[in-house]
């Protein structure tokens, strides 16, 4: 079929917009920006460039799957609405859904020279009012239990925005609570899931196609995501996915993890499936957006990926963003090391005693920080390249075996530093007992495989997809 703008949809996620009104240049914003993979200080500039790109594409609608703002600041929401209004003036229908950063956020801040100060956030009711034209006002069907809604921006195509956030559990001292607490995990309320499946079933019964979006992942984008990064995938995700499939939802756009990745989840007998199309953060390298074209002949959605390459005040946007990812390696190392240390650390005394039996000497780490430094010394290079591969998508196009072998060499060097006199025996133990458990996860990440080495294994093309409707 000949494509047209009337059946084109653009998808972006996690723009994390920080209003310029919240920033007075100085050391406060510089310090905050320096530790981010997100290009926070350039978020307004990037959103300006994205808006120009979207207007040039002239899609029927734009889906934004959450984390519209940096930390839920009211002024940032108001700034985002200005950009959406500009798109709307060109006949484009923006549609939004909140992310975990967007409502009831105790971390809302403004940056004033060398000071970081509290800023006003928004309630869920205020969010709905601000975005009344983009999901929550007249002409939209609302779920009474959440910020979920549905609409039909293209004739015969129903969009369902699903609220997967838990910010109703947040507490804010600015509102009289005793402490500030914040929840970034995902959960769909039972009554909301019931509402969503009813809407989807009705749409399918009427011969309409259904596309969903929400902030958190629905499918695991790598093996054991629900264990290693549980806050990035909705609770009870398999059951939720099965119910959505049964209701006729086969494509859902998500965000949250800031990676451009796709994963397919099947029902038990592989007769039905749902594709979770994750889109990376609009203000993180490689600055991805999705362009989806409806195909009536195949009843599918043809999804391609594009990248923003520059912004008015940041002509070297991609290189700056790439360096941010590399600079984040120490933080990733600390995160991974702490997860391992939480399990191994309490037994380190016993391990040390066992390895030093017979007079052997060891240099075992005694703290989580020392463990992190050990990992960083030997694995920083391979971790940086792996992070770049993951955020860029289509990791299988890279030299996976080279990365895996480099990682093994780094682990061997770690063992030799920590326990030089026992290195051969420990290396043998790693190869025979530890690595077989790690390998499915490693290959799942680096080869875009899910359910590795099982009868449900799938492999995705992260950047170019044909999604059935």
Regions found by a protein language model. Give the residues of each.
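N-terminal active-site segment of His-dependent metallophosphoesterases
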Residues: 1-77
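Active-site-proximal beta-strand elements of phosphoester/diester hydrolases
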Residues: 6-20, 32, 156-172, 213, ...
């Amino acid at each position: 079929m000949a494509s047209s703008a009337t059946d084109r949809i653009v998808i972006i996620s996690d723009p994390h917009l920080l209003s310029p009104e919240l920033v007075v240049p100085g050391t406060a914003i510089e310090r905050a920006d320096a530790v981010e993979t997100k290009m926070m200080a350039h978020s307004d500039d990037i959103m300006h460039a994205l808006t120009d790109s979207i207007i040039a594409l002239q899609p029927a609608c734009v889906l934004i799957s959450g984390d519209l703002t940096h930390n839920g600041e009211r002024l940032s929401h108001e700034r985002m609405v200005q950009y959406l209004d500009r798109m709307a003036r060109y006949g484009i229908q923006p549609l939004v859904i909140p992310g975990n950063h967007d409502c009831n956020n105790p971390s809302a801040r403004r940056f004033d020279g060398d000071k970081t100060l509290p800023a006003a956030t928004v309630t869920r009711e205020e969010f709905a009012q601000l975005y009344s034209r983009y999901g929550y006002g007249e002409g939209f069907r609302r779920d009474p239990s959440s910020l979920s809604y549905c609409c039909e921006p293209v004739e015969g195509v129903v969009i369902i925005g699903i609220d997967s956030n838990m910010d109703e559990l947040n507490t804010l001292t600015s509102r009289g609570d005793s402490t500030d607490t914040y929840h970034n995990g995902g959960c769909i309320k039972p009554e909301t899931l019931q509402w969503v499946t009813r809407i989807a079933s009705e749409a399918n019964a009427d011969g309409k196609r259904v596309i969903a979006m929400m902030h958190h992942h629905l499918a695991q984008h790598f093996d054991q995501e629900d264990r290693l990064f549980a806050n990035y995938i909705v609770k009870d995700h398999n059951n939720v996915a099965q119910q959505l499939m049964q209701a006729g939802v086969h494509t859902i756009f998500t965000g949250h993890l800031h990676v451009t990745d796709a994963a397919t989840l099947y029902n038990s007998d592989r007769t039905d499936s749902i594709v979770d199309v994750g889109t990376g953060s609009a203000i993180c390298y490689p600055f991805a957006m999705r362009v989806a074209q409806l195909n009536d002949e195949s009843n599918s959605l043809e999804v391609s990926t594009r990248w923003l390459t520059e912004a008015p005040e940041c002509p070297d946007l991609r290189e700056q963003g790439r360096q941010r990812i590399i600079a984040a390696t120490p933080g990733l190392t600390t995160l991974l090391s702490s997860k391992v240390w939480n399990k191994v650390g309490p037994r380190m005394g016993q391990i040390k005693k066992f390895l030093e039996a017979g007079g052997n000497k060891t240099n075992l780490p005694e703290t989580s920080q020392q463990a992190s430094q050990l990992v960083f010394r030997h694995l920083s290079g391979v971790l940086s390249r792996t992070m770049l591969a993951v955020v860029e998508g289509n990791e299988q196009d890279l030299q996976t075996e080279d990365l895996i072998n480099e990682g093994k060499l780094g682990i061997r060097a770690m063992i030799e530093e920590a326990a030089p006199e026992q290195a051969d025996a420990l290396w043998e133990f790693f190869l025979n007992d530890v690595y077989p458990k790690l390998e499915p996860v490693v290959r799942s990440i680096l080869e875009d495989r899910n359910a590795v080495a099982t009868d449900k294994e799938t492999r995705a093309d992260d950047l170019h997809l044909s999604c059935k409707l």
